[in-house]
């Protein structure tokens, strides 16, 4: 299925739903150079846990995930 990831740019990823959020962060790191530990992946404004699979998070085809940077001291 296709998934959209909006970080600094909008990216289209081909995924199965079995990928973990940590794997998506690693992919975003390779595309944009943002370290995985500095990323927060959001689905409808709610942060997703690194260990969870996309399927467990309720991610469906054509979903857009937002990637935000962690705020220091926030």
Curated annotation (Swiss-Prot):
GO terms (molecular function) for this protein are: protein tag activity; structural constituent of ribosome; ubiquitin protein ligase binding
Q: Name one GO biological process term.
A: protein ubiquitination
Can you tell which superkingdom this protein's organism belongs to?
Eukaryota
Q: Which InterPro entries match?
A: FUBI, Ubiquitin-like_dom, Ubiquitin-like_domsf, Ubiquitin_CS, Ubiquitin_dom
Q: Which SMART domains match?
A: UBQ (SM00213)
Could you identify this protein by its name? Ubiquitin-like protein FUBI
What's the family? Answer: Belongs to the ubiquitin family.
Show the GO cellular component annotation of the record. Answer: cytoplasm; cytosolic ribosome; cytosolic small ribosomal subunit; extracellular space; nucleus
- Tell me which stretches of the chain form a coiled coil: none
Q: What else is known?
A: This protein is synthesized with ribosomal S30 as its C-terminal extension.
